[in-house]
Amino acid sequence: MRRLKRLVFVGALVVTASVTAAAVATTPGSNGQIAFRRWLNDETSRSALYTINPDGTGVRRIVPRLRRAHDDQPDWSPDGRLLAFSRFPDDGPAWINVVNSDGTGLRRVTPRCTRKPAPNRVPRGCEDAANVSFTPDGQHLLFTRATGRVRQFPRYEWDQIEHAAVATIAIDGTDEREILRLGRYAGDVKFPQMSPDGRFILFERHNSPLRKPRMGQAIFVMNADGTNVHRVTPWKLRGGDNPDWAPDSSRILFRSQEEADAERAQFYTVRPDGTGLTRLTNFPKKHRRVFSASFSPDGAQIVYARANDDRERGDLWLMDADGTNHRRLYAVPAADSAPDWGGLASSP
């Protein structure tokens, strides 16, 4: 099945369940390892997940790569003991995995598809599950799932899935529930993430050609039970690329111009009510492009991926939380991106 592009619109919203959460995801001063994705070929069709220490040492592959698939979207559990990620096969729907921080105990969380879906349809039981993140209690995962028929929009070079939803599931694969579902062919959601205090869920919304502004993109926030959905970033910024909560839940970190003009991308923060929009960076155009970012657990630093003017491939960089003091963390010939900064692993 051709990988579906993901768009977002919250129209004809149906609230079906709530998610409860406990403590914050990480505690101040508990900076642990950074997980990230490494592209293994120039076509960005093969990738694997790695971890690295905050000082740039200890790079290692966290889980063996499955043939004819790529692993993406790593997210640490609040206690730093587990890593959740999405696995995208070449032919078929994506699914969610969880693995121990040392690379052992790999297990599938979302259900296995028992039949091969048609190229233009994703039936129930074969939902495309991706964009995973832990809830603050460490026992559940938020993710997006897509199902239904695929509608093509040739003018926009876009394939739109019929139904898209934000859902939650226990890490043992039980208790799967929807939090919200979008209207038919209205768009799709990406990267739902619950605030560390458990009050809110952020997500990206990309309008389909059927909604205005057509192909628009912005970040939205809703209550943890799926109510009070509201936009927090201007449409013109096209904010997204795996937004991240500050450890104290006060701000949302995001990149502008996702999937639009990457050479004009900058990092911003905004409050969950949409106020306090602050630009953190002033990259010149010659920096080529930047990618998604993640707060450190103590809230003092940010890790992000950046392709310099002399390199087309991304390296991992650090900056202070106010957007200053940029320094390269690690550089290799491969392309590294999609970092997630975890806390120090606690004892069992």
Region locations from a protein language model:
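Bacterial N-terminal signal peptides that target proteins for export
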Residues: 1-8
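Sequence signature of WD/YWTD-type beta-propeller architectures
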Residues: 2, 13, 21-348
